Structure formats: C-alpha cells, structure tokens
Amino acid sequence: METPAQLLFLLLLWLPDTTGEIVLTQSPGTLSLSPGERATLSCRASQSVSSSYLAWYQQKPGQAPRLLIYGASSRATGIPDRFSGSGSGTDFTLTISRLEPEDFAVYYCQQYGSSP
C-alpha cells in the first residue's frame, strides 16, 4: 500500500504598497496526497491585487524556486499542463490535476510589481 507523501506550501511574501502591506496567506499548510490525485492550493490576499501580478513557484530542497505560473493563470515556459492557475481580486488557486512523484515540493504564491 502506497503511503501518501506530503505536499507543502507556505505563506510567502508581503510587499509594501501605498496603502500599506499586502499580505498573502496560503492554505492549507500541508496536504497529504498520493501520485495521481488532484491538489488544490489557495492563496488569499489581504487586499485586492491585479491578476497580472500574481505568480506561483515550486521549490525543492537545495534548489532555487521555479516559476510555474505568472499573471495568475499563464504557465511559464516548460511547465506541464497539469499545472493551472486561476482567480482574481483577493482569491487565487493553483491546481495540479494529477500529481506526479516530482510534484511533491513546497509551493509559494507571490504578488509582484504593482497593484491597482
């Protein structure tokens, strides 16, 4: 029987803005899933951010973060189509449709650039 592996993702970043800090909170903190299952990761901003400036990253131990999604829903070059991003305003989601063994990692969302 296969033991579920852990999929982790965390709060990443706050950026100063003219109206104060934008705080991004991710949930849940840990997912226990097996290869082939679907993963849904949520990122909530403390105030509305432009979808144009929301990114998702994957990081594995000892490696630099890898850009997965930019502009909330656009896949970076070379990213498999099992990764998809969606959302707007304050609520954003990263979905991995069918987990592969190499997908077990830490995931971050980031607000970058400007916000309206």
From Swiss-Prot:
- Keyword annotations: Adaptive immunity, Cell membrane, Disulfide bond, Immunity, Immunoglobulin, Immunoglobulin domain, Membrane, Secreted, Signal
The record's disulfide annotation reads C43-C109
Region Framework-1, as annotated, extends over 21-43
- Spell out the Gene3D superfamilies in the cross-references: Immunoglobulins
Q: Where is region (Complementarity-determining-1) located? A: 44-55
Q: Give the residue ranges for region: Framework-2.
A: 56-70
* Annotated segments matching region Framework-3: 78-109
One example of a Gene Ontology biological process annotation? glomerular filtration
Cellular component GO terms, alphabetically? blood microparticle; extracellular exosome; extracellular region; extracellular space; immunoglobulin complex; monomeric IgA immunoglobulin complex; pentameric IgM immunoglobulin complex; plasma membrane
- Cross-referenced PANTHER family: IMMUNOGLOBULIN LIGHT CHAIN
Q: What name goes with this protein?
A: Immunoglobulin kappa variable 3-20
Its lineage reads: Eukaryota, Metazoa, Chordata, Craniata, Vertebrata
